[in-house]
């Protein structure tokens, strides 16, 4: 009995090898908007958008018949596995029963996915319903957002408090003039009362008019505390507001292109930052102080009959709120002048001192900023600047770290901003979309309606 060997000693039968994807013929992809695309862009668009339907391939040549009495392998459709089919008298498979499959390619594999769509552009924002946008806009128009905090009428408030303060002091002094003693003698009850109130408010303390009874001393204690705690602060705010307003008007006038020789004032005004330079603020404040001292000395020499040295001495001691008490205003005209002059001069001196402190602080901040921006980043600073710990520092992270290092912002400010971002990022995806914004507006509207319903 003849046994057929399991392995043939002759040459093995040729296998059916499919061509690789890189050996397949690639048709040129030409998008409608680009007439002559490069091969690189063609490959990129084929990978992203998928392949066009390839032309029908030519019929492959029939495989050579295997030798008689030999085993052959045929492809069985199913799980894409080659299953050996044994037969004693095999017959070559016909092309009609088992047509050869088309050679697979990478583009066919990518193009067969259903989650990829052929799209030339990506949407700029999340697709939203037009009705939802219109409803959100209507709700935003119906509910008035809270207005930004505005500066109160500080000038009016300061003026009213000053009138109330002076009226209270003048009334008490004029009603009970015997409770106060004057070293220079009384002139007029109202003038002496107004002079006493202004000297007390400006914390000068000449000592020429003093309380003599316990009731007057109790009144003086409350009068000093009220004046020091409230009215003086309001007057300082009023002076700051008036000076800032004048500065804004000057800056606006200089920004007008019709103004002549506006570039010559850049030494005084910083037009880029929209403010007056600190040095010029100090110079102007000191000039105002010098004018106040000069005016006071001239009036003292004429009204109080003092020499120039004593007049300048008393003026300087008055505007700096020292008030030794060796000299004071003794005449009626002098006390009326002092009631207005002391109020303006002492506030001008205080503002000059604040500008001096601002100049020193600004100089220190500039030196710190130059030092921070001139040096390189170390490894520890890199790790500190990497906020999200992803191994690299973005431009925004670098800017935030440098601002923190220069003292422009603090960690508390950053945390407050991050908390606001987290509240607006309802999807917790690290970004704010228009849908998130509309959703937050809708939530705010619902909360307001619930509050109104509870109140009603």
UniProtKB/Swiss-Prot annotation:
A GO-annotated cellular component: plant-type vacuole membrane
Segments forming domain EF-hand: 373-408, 412-447
Keyword flag Phosphoprotein: no
Name the UniProt record assigns to this protein: Two pore potassium channel c
Residues annotated as transmembrane: 153-173, 223-243, 280-300, 336-356
Ligand binding (Ca(2+) 1): 386, 388, 390, 392, 397
Cytoplasmic side: 1-152, 244-279, 357-456
Entry's Gene Ontology BP terms: potassium ion transmembrane transport
Intramembrane positions: 192-211, 310-329
Topological type in the membrane: Multi-pass membrane protein
Gene: TPKC
Record function comment: Inward-rectifying potassium channel.
Pfam families: Ion_trans_2
Residues involved in Ca(2+) 2 binding: 425, 431, 436
Assembly and oligomerization: Homodimer.
Keywords associated with the record: Calcium, Ion channel, Ion transport, Membrane, Metal-binding, Potassium, Potassium channel, Potassium transport, Repeat, Transmembrane, Transmembrane helix, Transport
GO MF annotation, one: metal ion binding
UniProt-listed InterPro entries: 2pore_dom_K_chnl, EF-hand-dom_pair, EF_Hand_1_Ca_BS, K_chnl_dom
Domain of life: Eukaryota
Extent of Pro residues compositional bias: 52-67
Organism of origin: Oryza sativa subsp. japonica (Rice)
């Amino acid at each position: 009995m003849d046994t057929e060997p399991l392995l043939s000693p002759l040459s093995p039968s040729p296998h059916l090898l499919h061509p690789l994807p890189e050996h397949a013929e690639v048709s040129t992809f030409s998008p409608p908007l680009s007439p002559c695309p490069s091969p690189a862009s063609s490959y990129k668009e084929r990978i992203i958008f998928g392949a066009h339907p390839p032309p029908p391939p030519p019929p492959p040549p029939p495989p050579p018949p295997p030798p008689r009495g030999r085993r052959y392998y045929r492809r069985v459709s199913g799980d894409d596995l080659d299953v050996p089919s044994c037969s004693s008298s095999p017959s070559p498979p016909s092309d009609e029963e088992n047509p050869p499959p088309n050679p697979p390619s990478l583009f066919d594999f990518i193009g067969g996915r259903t989650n990829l769509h052929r799209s030339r552009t990506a949407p700029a924002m999340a697709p939203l319903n037009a009705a939802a946008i219109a409803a959100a806009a209507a709700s935003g128009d119906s509910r008035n957002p809270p207005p930004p905090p505005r500066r109160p009428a500080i000038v009016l408030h300061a003026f009213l408090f000053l009138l109330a303060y002076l009226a209270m002091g003048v009334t008490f002094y004029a009603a009970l003039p015997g409770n106060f003693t004057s070293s220079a003698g009384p002139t007029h009850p109202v003038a002496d009362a107004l002079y006493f109130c202004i000297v007390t408010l400006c914390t000068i303390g000449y000592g020429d008019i003093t309380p003599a009874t316990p009731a007057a001393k109790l009144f003086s204690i409350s009068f000093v505390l009220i004046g020091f705690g409230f009215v003086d602060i309001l007057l300082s705010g009023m002076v700051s507001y008036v000076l800032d307003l004048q500065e804004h008007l000057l800056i606006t006038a200089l920004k007008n292109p019709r103004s002549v020789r506006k570039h010559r004032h850049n030494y005084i005004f910083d037009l880029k930052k929209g403010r007056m330079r600190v040095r010029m603020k100090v110079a102007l404040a000191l000039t105002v102080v010098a004018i106040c001292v000069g005016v006071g000395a001239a009036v003292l020499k004429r009204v109080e009959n003092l020499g120039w040295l004593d007049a300048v001495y008393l003026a300087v001691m008055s505007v700096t709120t020292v008030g030794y008490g060796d000299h004071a205003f003794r005449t009626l005209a002098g006390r009326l002048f002092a009631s207005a002059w002391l109020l303006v001069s002492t506030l001008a001196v205080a503002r000059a001192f604040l500008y001096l402190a601002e100049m020193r602080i600004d100089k220190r901040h500039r030196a710190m900023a130059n030092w921070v921006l001139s040096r390189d980043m170390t490894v520890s600073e890199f790790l500190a600047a990497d906020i999200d710990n992803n191994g690299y520092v973005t431009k925004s992270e670098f800017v935030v770290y440098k601002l923190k290092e220069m003292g422009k912002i603090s960690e508390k400010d950053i945390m407050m901003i991050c908390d606001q971002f987290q509240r607006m990022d309802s999807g917790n995806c690290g970004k704010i979309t228009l849908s998130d914004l509309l959703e937050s507006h809708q939530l705010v509207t619902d909360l307001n309606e619930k509050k109104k319903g509870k109140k009603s």
